[in-house]
From Swiss-Prot:
It comes from Methanosarcina acetivorans (strain ATCC 35395 / DSM 2834 / JCM 12185 / C2A). It comes from the Archaea. GO terms for cellular component: cytosolic large ribosomal subunit. GO terms for biological process: translation. This is Large ribosomal subunit protein eL39. Gene3D superfamilies: Ribosomal protein L39e. The gene is rpl39e. Transmembrane segments: none annotated. GO terms for molecular function: structural constituent of ribosome. It holds the Pfam family Ribosomal_L39. InterPro entries: Ribosomal_eL39, Ribosomal_eL39_CS, Ribosomal_eL39_dom_sf.
Length: 51
């Protein structure tokens, strides 16, 4: 990670932040119609297209 460019690190950080679960209040508000996150990514199963 030490030789990465700042832009790439920034994009990796954004991907890291986006990779979170659906908030509990959303699940409660939608009466459990929304429980899964379609863009959720597992580090071993799906790779990132970071340039």
């Amino acid at each position: 990670m030490s030789h990465n460019m700042k832009g790439q690190k920034k994009r990796l950080a954004k991907a890291h932040k986006q990779n979170t679960r659906v908030p509990v209040w959303v699940i409660v508000k939608t009466n459990r119609k929304v429980v899964s996150h379609p863009r959720r990514r597992h580090w071993r199963r799906r790779s990132l297209d970071v340039k």
